[in-house]
Amino acid sequence: MYSIKCDDNKAMPRERLMRLGAESLSNQELLAILLRTGNKEKHVLELSSYLLSHLDSLADFKKMSLQELQHLAGIGKVKAIEIKAMIELVSRILAIDKTLTDSVLTSVQVAEKMMAALGDKKQEHLVVLYLDNQNRIIEEKTIFIGTVRRSLAEPREILYYACKNMATSLIVIHNHPSGNIEPSSNDYCFTEKIKRSCEDLGIICLDHIIVSYKDYYSFREKSTLF
């Protein structure tokens, strides 16, 4: 059975999340936030503890029907639907990550992942995916976060980790906080520079992708640089 610890000092999971971040919360607290309220017999933390104690693992959530979830947790249909929707969303996120690590990458796959990761950032972030000879990700590395004095990174910073990982190829991604994905003249110059630097070391630059929260631009798909 799933092991649960009930701690009276953790009675405010939402406040703890705001102070410490979601990763600091227990499964019990995270579930309590989703449940929002308890039922007639149990406080919300007691209810989440009770529900988790009847599972062998968190994966059991996905196997449960709406009716089973309602019956076990003593919650209404709306709350059960919300929990099932969250579980399905998490499953889809994990499916994207698995696709990226297990199979050949396409610009669309990378763009979808990075639109979710970088689309809401207020500063420019430059991320590089380092790949092996089967196009599997060796490392995903944030190389640079923009400042008012500087945007994008130098090729040597990108290539340092390529050599460290013994990568065969790489994909460069950065976001445009403005939401406009059209590449600037600096983006073109940077792409030419990193592509040339990669070629000098025998590394393949597969693509440079610009993302916003809802769209992307692939230099491989839309420019003549590749």
From Swiss-Prot:
The keyword Metal-binding applies. GO terms for biological process: proteolysis. Keywords: Hydrolase, Metal-binding, Metalloprotease, Protease, Zinc. A motif (JAMM motif) lies at residues 174-187. Zn(2+) binds at residues 174, 176, 187. InterPro entries: MPN (IPR037518), RadC_JAB (IPR025657), RuvA_2-like (IPR010994), UPF0758 (IPR001405), UPF0758_CS (IPR020891), UPF0758_N (IPR046778). GO terms for molecular function: metal ion binding; metallopeptidase activity. The keyword RNA-binding does not apply. Pfam families: RadC, UPF0758_N. Signal peptide: none annotated. It comes from the Bacteria. Residues 103-225 form the MPN domain. PANTHER family: DNA REPAIR PROTEIN RADC, UPF0758 PROTEIN YEES-RELATED. Belongs to the UPF0758 family. This is UPF0758 protein M6_Spy0838. It comes from Streptococcus pyogenes serotype M6 (strain ATCC BAA-946 / MGAS10394).
